[in-house]
UniProtKB/Swiss-Prot annotation:
GO terms for molecular function: 3-phosphoshikimate 1-carboxyvinyltransferase activity. GO terms for cellular component: cytoplasm. Its EC number is 2.5.1.19. This is 3-phosphoshikimate 1-carboxyvinyltransferase. InterPro entries: Enolpyruvate_Tfrase_dom, Enolpyruvate_Tfrase_sf, EPSP_synthase, EPSP_synthase_CS, RNA3'P_cycl/enolpyr_Trfase_a/b. 3-phosphoshikimate binds at residues 28-29, 33, 168-170, 316, 343. It comes from Rhodococcus jostii (strain RHA1). The active site is at residue 316. It comes from the Bacteria. The gene is aroA. Coiled coil: none annotated.
Amino acid sequence: METVSLSLWNAPRAEAPVVATVALPGSKSITNRALILAALADGPSTLTGALRSRDTDLMIEALRTLGISIETVGADTTLRVTPGPLQGGAVDCGLAGTVMRFLPPVAALASGTVHFDGDEQARTRPLDTILDALRGLGADIDGASLPFTVRGAGSLRGGRVTIDASGSSQFVSGLLLSAAAFDEGVTVHHDGKTVPSMPHIDMTVEMLRESGVEVTTPATGGEADTWRVSPGVVRAVDRAIEPDLSNATAFLAAAAVTGGEVTVPLWPSRTTQPGDAIREILLAMGADVRLDGANLTVRGPQQLTGIDIDLHDVGELTPTVAALAALADGPSHLRGIAHLRGHETDRLAALAHEINSLGGNVTETEDGLTIVPAGLHGGTWRSYADHRMATAGAIVGLRVDGIRIEDVGTTAKTLPGFENLWATMLSAAAGTERKASF
């Protein structure tokens, strides 16, 4: 069997407090939702500030395969999306959960057969929840995970379906995003443990409403754990995409762990992005956090304190928080994140193993991690083809000599050029502000 060798990136250590302004590209979660809605809309839409990364480019190519025209206008972050008749084809999902969970409902509306596949690692990710739901709504689908086939009939009946979305909020969002195009719309009822990452469902609902779609939720007087999308027209909407706040967390963490100061411009005052929770997390760990107009600035303390926190709704921040906790001066307890075992990798096991391999003291619990301060040393940090694992290693590397990150290029999934952006942040002398831009 041939052995694949992955390159190692020497994570730079901060020799002084980081002082920088870091401009981040658009949100992956918003970009891919906006692309789906634009593809199903009643006319052309323009998306400004869209993220161009592996995940979003996979979504763009998948929609083009299905018959949607997507063109760049000037900068490659401005996209003109023109709907067209949906057709069959072959879709590469890569490792993008949004592609493998948001596209099958669109494929069910196509006139033709759509074959889905992705990276080898993606074939282990659970998809039976959304595929079984689509079958219950009238779709013809072979398979329960990648690879699978959707035989589109040009329309989908829709109706009511009960699912267990405790593994991922994307199962709910995936059904809701296309539901206005179903003959009967859709009613999605969740039966199971609490749905994780609820802000992502809130994001989906808000964007649907901005597109003129009628949505009933538990928060607006609907049935508990139930979301209803009425059939109707998806209005074409031009959108300006917010910066990706989850990607910003690693750069803000750089200020926190070095006692420095990092500013991220264009931070929204109101947002459904889970990444916004980093403000309260860093504050609780001793950092100074200020939102001044559209600029968010974090100033790091002399020493971070530990934290006891339920991350259930913002689980994607766990790698950043775990890295912070590994460098804090007291124990931390990260709870409510058992669902992370089904992400790009088992993030709980991966974080525990990588921190412990550097001399750390991390224990897996039933639904999270307990992290006790310990002297860390250099070593190889595996990324597991997981972009957030790679950035977590970079955070640790700011304070620990000799951290070598395996396959840092996996960050291109949501933030291509991460290494250059990270290096630019660290490039000038302490006390001299520098600006890193995507």
